[in-house]
Structure formats: C-alpha cells, structure tokens
Amino acid sequence: MIEKSFKYFENKNIDFSINLSFHDISNEYIIDYLLYKLEEYNLYNNLIIEILENESIIDFDLVRNFVEKMKSLGVRIAIDDFGSGYSNFNYILELEPNFIKIDGSIIKKIHNCEKSFKITKAIVLFAKELNIKIIAEFIHNQNVYDKIFELEFDGYQGYFFSEPIEDITNYNMG
C-alpha cells in the first residue's frame, strides 16, 4: 500500500495520509521500507501519517522515536479516530501530533446532542491551545457542517463533501 500511495501522489503536489497501527510502527521492515520510499519519491512534506488511536500502544518510547524521526524529515503526524479509544490525552502528551481527527461517533451527533457539541468544543479549544490542527470526520449533512464550521475546525471530511473516491488499491501502477 505504501508503494501504491506514493506512486499515486508522486506528481500531484497535494497532502495525503497513510494509516499506521502500533503493530506497523513496531515492524522494522515496514519502517525501513517507508523511509526508503520517502527518499525515493521525495514526498516528505506531503505525507501525513495517521496513528490509529483505537489501538493500544504498548511501547511509547518506540512510537515517540518513530514520530520524532518522521517529524524531523518533514512528515506530519495525526491521531486518527480521536475519541474512540481510552488513551486519547496520553497520546497527545506522548506523541505531540500535528493533527487530531475527531472520530465520527462524536461528530455525527453534534447537531442534535448538546453533550456531543460540548465535548467537541472542549477538544477544539484544548487543541488550539496546543497548536494542534483539528479535523472533523463523518460530516454527512448541512446541519453537522454548520456546527463544525461554528467551532472553527481546520479540516473536514465526510460524505457531505464527497463520497469516497476510487480505492487506491485499484490504481494502475502503469
């Protein structure tokens, strides 16, 4: 998937993300391959690595070293599915991400659930205090978008903007 992603975005000059789990990050082969492909395609400043929040990180030192290495190369880090797991704030303290992507399970109810709105607002406020950009997942209608817009998110994603595009795994490698 790394090769296909890099090949697909090689000449597009846009940011793109790949998801990595703790298991992926702890696999030396995967990390060496990622570093090799980063050098080959020179996409350091376009890549955002999304670390899956809903998976337990067993070795924070290993992940922190990985994050520091990636950031030193210009790669940005996001915590994906923020709000879906148990260690959210610890992840922020330990990994110092560039982005937090708030999980759709919180966002999808923001327009008709006051608790969801207040929780989201609190996450946005603390993220801004820490200079972390915040992205809303699962924006599926105008009402949800209006609430997210009110909170001044940095980025948005969901069916309201576009249905998923062609799966990159189907991309013709040429």
Where in the sequence are the language-model features?
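Alpha-helical scaffolding segments of alpha/beta enzyme cores, especially the outer helices
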Residues: K7, Y29-Y36, L62-S72, K118-L125, ...
